[in-house]
């Protein structure tokens, strides 16, 4: 198993892409902490996956700084460290033409996508720099390379994540830490 003994933390990990990532990491031998808002969905996942003490759920909201930072800290407290962070939580939010998009909707999309990625990354780096090893994987989108009508906030957020990924990768690359973004196309999920 390629990830035997590694500790992974996945935001938005109880459904969709995040659940798939969590299950793949478990299959490769990692222990995994998932953060999600929906307790019922997370408990269902825990029961269905049945990974025993290698899978834990920590309730949290990606739009709340204390939740995201607390998730990373609780993962480290439970498993002893954080080796891999997958910043997966996020979404498109309010799909409106730019002229109709409210400041509140734009800000919410930034918090859900950009700020949550920043908060998780910054906190995980605290642990990863101490151990001189880590992997941060940011789930972005093809929209982070292009643009689409009515996705102004989402496209802006994903462009920001791609820029953040490149900057942080250059900051910490000499310390045994890699930072990458994955830019999937449209994925139909149950979130």
Residue ranges and their predicted role:
Residues 7, 14-16:
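Conserved glycine-rich cofactor-binding loop
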Residues 39, 59-71, 103:
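The beta1-alpha1 cofactor-binding region of Rossmann-like NAD(H)/NADP(H)-dependent oxidoreductases
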Residues 96-98, 102-110, 136:
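Substrate-binding pocket helix/loop in short-chain dehydrogenase/reductase
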Residues 97, 101, 147-155, 167, ...:
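Active-site loop-to-helix junction immediately N-terminal to the catalytic Tyr of the SDR YXXXK motif
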Residues 121, 157, 165:
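Active-site helix of classical SDR
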Residues 126, 170-174:
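Alpha-helical segment proximal to the catalytic Tyr-Lys
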Residues 141:
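Residue(s) in the substrate-gating loop at a strand-loop-helix junction
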């Amino acid at each position: 198993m390629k990830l035997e003994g590694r500790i992974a933390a996945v935001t938005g990990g109880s459904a969709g892409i995040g659940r798939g990532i969590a299950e793949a990491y478990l299959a490769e031998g990692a222990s995994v902490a998932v953060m999600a808002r929906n307790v019922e969905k997370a408990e269902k996942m825990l029961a269905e996956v049945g990974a025993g003490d290698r899978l834990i759920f920590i309730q949290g909201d990606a739009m709340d700084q204390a939740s995201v930072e607390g998730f990373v800290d609780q993962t480290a407290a439970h498993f002893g460290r954080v080796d891999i962070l997958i910043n997966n939580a996020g979404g498109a939010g309010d799909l409106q033409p730019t002229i109709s998009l409210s400041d509140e909707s734009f800000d919410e999309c930034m918090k859900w996508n950009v700020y949550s990625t920043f908060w998780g990354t910054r906190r995980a780096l605290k642990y990863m720099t101490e151990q001189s090893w880590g992997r941060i994987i940011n789930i972005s989108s093809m929209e982070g390379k292009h643009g689409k009508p009515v996705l102004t906030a989402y496209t802006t957020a994903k462009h920001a994540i791609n820029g953040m990924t490149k900057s942080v990768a250059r900051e910490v690359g000499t310390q045994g830490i890699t930072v990458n973004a994955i830019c999937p196309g449209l994925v139909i999920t149950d979130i």
